[in-house]
Amino acid sequence: MVSKIIKLGVPTATLAVGTLLLGDDEKRSAFFRTASAFTQNHGHKTFDEHFPRGEWDKNWDFRDPISLVDKGKWEKADEEGKKKLIEEKKATATRNIFLIRHGQYHLDHEVKMLTPLGREQAELLGKRLANSDIKFTNMTMSTMVRATETANIILKHLPDDLTRTSSPFIEEGPPYPPVPDHKTWRPLDPEFYTEAARIESAYRKIFHRASPSQKEDSFELIVCHANVIRYFICRALQFPPEGWLRMSLGNCSLTWITIRPKGHVSVRSIGDIGHLPPNKISFT
């Protein structure tokens, strides 16, 4: 507590010493009144000195309307024409991306197929999605066996006409050298170099605001792997990518990320396993 007070500056430290002579309620009231006043006068500067923060990149997906305008048309257009060109490129729909981790699988098996528990987890998730009253737009699944098995079990509970595709780009792999290092899991640099490029490519393909031609909100299912999902979360929120390994995701967990028309990104849930009873939860 003392070290935090010192970091906030002398006026706050002086206040803290003075409040030692007051009762508990009086201490809290006096401290926060003065701390509030101090923050209003010095808050942003003081806070930023000790907790540096980066700016949000508004054009993180390079789909800001002006980025999509044809340069030739832009140069020839007058002011009204430029406004019209920008308006035509504005997104109006919201994209909802549901990242699903596969079910529990046999770690020691060459094919790494789902265990009986993993299949049961996928069934329970499929039922949850079917009862959600959400009209899902499409599903993309990793080509690895455990993800494909999970996706196919889920699909039994969803409409037959749901568009589905497979992608090798969202297969499991090391997305970025983690900080801190893992004690036992240490891929070689060449593996990071190649796999990180693949997973980053998948991120750029999947995560972006809606196309101007998309008129309705979309609800997209992505069935893949823990490393990939955790990296996607960091990138989507513009968090340091080296922090991806600090999160843990259960099998058949659900992560919901929303991308709004202006490019604002928000996370509605991370690793949600509310559809699994306690005895069906696993993290393998």
From Swiss-Prot:
GO terms for MF: phosphoprotein phosphatase activity; protein serine/threonine phosphatase activity
Species name: Caenorhabditis elegans
PANTHER family membership: PHOSPHOGLYCERATE MUTASE-RELATED (PTHR20935), SERINE_THREONINE-PROTEIN PHOSPHATASE PGAM5, MITOCHONDRIAL (PTHR20935:SF0)
SMART domains in alphabetical order: PGAM
Membrane topology note: Single-pass membrane protein
Localisation: Mitochondrion outer membrane
Assigned EC number: 3.1.3.16
Main location: mitochondrion
Self-association and partners: Interacts with skn-1 isoforms a and c.
GO BP term, pick one: positive regulation of mitochondrial fission
Keywords associated with the record: Hydrolase, Membrane, Mitochondrion, Mitochondrion outer membrane, Transmembrane, Transmembrane helix
Gene: pgam-5
GO cellular component, as recorded: mitochondrial outer membrane; mitochondrion
Enzyme type, top EC level: hydrolase
Catalytic activity: O-phospho-L-seryl-[protein] + H2O = L-seryl-[protein] + phosphate; O-phospho-L-threonyl-[protein] + H2O = L-threonyl-[protein] + phosphate
Name listed for the protein in its UniProt record: Serine/threonine-protein phosphatase Pgam5, mitochondrial
Transmembrane residue ranges: 8-24
